[in-house]
UniProtKB/Swiss-Prot annotation:
Entry EC number(s): 2.3.3.13
UniProt region (Regulatory domain), positions on chain: 392-511
Gene: leuA
Domain of life: Bacteria
Co-factor requirement: Mn(2+)
GO cellular component, one term: cytosol
Keyword set includes Ligase: no
Matching InterPro entries: 2-IPM_HCS-like (IPR050073), 2-isopropylmalate_synth_dimer (IPR013709), AIPM/Hcit_synth_CS (IPR002034), Aldolase_TIM (IPR013785), LeuA/HCS_post-cat (IPR054691), LeuA_allosteric_dom_sf (IPR036230), LeuA_bact_synth (IPR005671), PYR_CT (IPR000891)
Name of this chain's protein: 2-isopropylmalate synthase
Primary role: Catalyzes the condensation of the acetyl group of acetyl-CoA with 3-methyl-2-oxobutanoate (2-ketoisovalerate) to form 3-carboxy-3-hydroxy-4-methylpentanoate (2-isopropylmalate).
SMART domains: LeuA_dimer
Subunit structure: Homodimer.
GO molecular function: 2-isopropylmalate synthase activity; acetyl-CoA C-acetyltransferase activity; manganese ion binding
Length: 511
């Protein structure tokens, strides 16, 4: 493609830094596979030195994904770079992304280093990273608040050292579009060897301007944008991949570049990330929200019926919405089930996983007349999640009576041993959670509890999301069922398993 715009997805690294959005290794692999199908150019799989879990996630994604460049973040430290290089050994194509802070406040207060020392360390880091891969990215952290003369100096030095991508982060989301675009254009114009590297933008959404700032960067010469599915990320989030990609593609009259992204997988990627992290997509979210292509006003409806382009600037099916989706039911066979999952971008590593998902599908079909794509994705997500859980919900019995306390009896399998507990309290969900907690012995603080319907109708699957805090660690749990209390129990158990898996998890840096 002439004048290609590179898409660098950091959902698995920066996106995971959203409180409660921590992902297991297997969940990261599932998301990475969808990103690969979307033809994402670079997947930042994690921060290898942060923990054993992060190292294994980067290593596994590097071994599984073949068609995207796999990247690991590292500070400008020898130990970080060596760890990243080791984790990326199995990658078909790899990149090391190293960074150091360049703003006055960061250099003085955090690093306690002089500008000369910072340049020296950045150059040394790039040269060390080149031992492992020819594809090295350098980021001057907090570039948005850094002195431009110093930025030019350190960028020139790191390009001379071998950096092939220079990423300019607006770490705290402080810039506005015109300002950020001018910065990108100025840096490209002032750095003597800028033609030897691709310039990139990494914007945060603290002022709601991440996508706008990134687009401004593209208009001013950036040819890589770092983004996340659903705009997931620290604080207010990052540049939304789906919004960035479709803005560039829809406004080809303004942008003289395009991406290789297969946009038909955007919706399935959005739903998978939402399901894994528990961060529900707001209905009015651009591109992937439930109302993104809905028209209620009579004049709008009439216009769309007569000629779609009167009120729609994109086709819904281009990003994965299927107006003529196949509705499955109790009489649908295994092949139709498998074919539909494939169309949704869902794959299983073995027949056992497919068989388990099909069994759950049949169980749901006995309770629900029509099963839609959203139901299938929820079922598959639950199937793939439970395969590696140490705590499993065996059964739940709840007794309720108006004006009386509710009783919940829970049977859990903990390390393959069944245990039973009963709790009595004013609420059925509360009683269920108390009974579960009494069996696990894990002290949990419930920070968030939300319920939503996966599809329409009184027989719809209910999706419950919980956010749990344990010893300062925040995780999300998700469960689906036609019964809300059962879905709540599944979500709570899912969260507890994440708590167990998240021990010794290190804190990630901000860029």
């Amino acid at each position: 493609m002439p004048n290609k715009l590179i898409i660098f997805d950091t959902t698995l690294r920066d996106g995971e830094q959203s409180p409660g959005a921590s992902m297991t290794r297997d969940e990261k692999v599932r998301i990475a596979k969808v990103l690969e199908k979307m033809q994402v150019d670079v997947i930042e799989a994690g921060f290898a030195i942060a923990s054993v879990g992060d190292f294994e996630a980067v290593q596994t994604v590097a071994n599984v994904v073949q068609d995207s460049i796999i990247c690991s973040l590292s500070r400008a430290l020898d130990k970080d770079i060596d760890c990243a290089g080791e984790a990326l050994k199995g990658a078909n194509a790899s990149r090391i992304h190293t960074f150091i802070a360049t703003s006055d406040i960061h250099m003085k207060m955090k690093l306690q280093m002089t500008p000369d020392q910072v340049v020296e360390q950045a150059v040394r880091a790039v040269k060390r990273a080149k031992r492992y891969t020819n594809d090295v990215e350098f980021s001057p952290e907090d570039a948005g608040r850094s002195d431009e003369d110093f930025l030019c100096r350190i960028i020139e030095a790191t390009i001379n050292a071998g950096a092939t991508t220079i990423n300019i982060p607006d770490t705290v989301g402080y810039n506005i579009p015109h300002q950020f675009g001018v910065t990108i254009k100025s840096l490209i114009g002032r750095v003597p060897n800028s033609d030897k590297a691709i310039f990139s933008a990494h914007c945060h959404n603290d002022l709601g301007l991440a996508v706008a700032n990134s687009l401004s960067a593209v208009l001013n010469g950036a040819r890589q944008v770092e983004c996340t599915i659903n705009g997931l990320g620290e604080r207010a989030g990052n540049t939304s991949l789906e919004e960035l990609v479709m803005a560039v593609r829809t406004r080809q009259d303004i942008f003289d570049c395009d991406t290789d992204i297969n946009a038909t997988h955007i919706l399935s990627a959005s739903r998978l990330v939402s399901s894994v992290t528990g961060f529900i997509v707001q209905p009015n979210k651009a591109i992937v929200g439930a109302n993104a292509f809905a028209h209620e006003a009579g004049i709008h409806q009439d216009g769309v019926i007569k000629y779609r382009e009167t009120y729609e600037i994109m086709r819904a099916e281009d990003v994965g919405w299927n107006a003529n989706q196949l509705v499955l039911g109790k009489h649908s066979g295994r092949n139709a089930f498998k074919v539909r999952l494939a169309e949704l971008g869902v794959e299983f590593n073995n027949e056992e996983g497919l068989n388990d998902a099909f069994r759950r599908f049949k169980e749901l079909a006995d309770k629900k007349h029509e099963i839609f794509d959203e139901d299938l994705q929820a079922l598959v997500s639950e199937t793939q999640t439970e395969a590696y859980e140490a705590i499993k919900l065996v059964s739940l019995k709840v007794c309720t009576e108006t004006g009386e306390k509710n009783t919940a009896t829970v049977v859990l399998s903990i390390d393959d041993k069944e245990q039973t507990a009963t709790a009595n309290t004013s609420g059925a969900v509360d009683a269920t959670f108390i009974a579960i907690s009494s069996l696990t012995g894990i002290k949990i603080n419930l920070q968030l509890y939300s319920v939503s319907n996966v599809t329409q109708g009184t027989d719809a699957l209910g999706e419950v999301n919980v956010r749990l805090e344990c010893n300062g660690r925040i995780v999300n749990g998700q469960g689906v069922d036609t019964d809300i209390i059962t879905a709540s129990a599944k979500a709570y158990v899912h969260g507890l398993n994440k708590v167990l898996a998240a021990t010794n998890k290190a804190q990630h840096p901000q860029i």
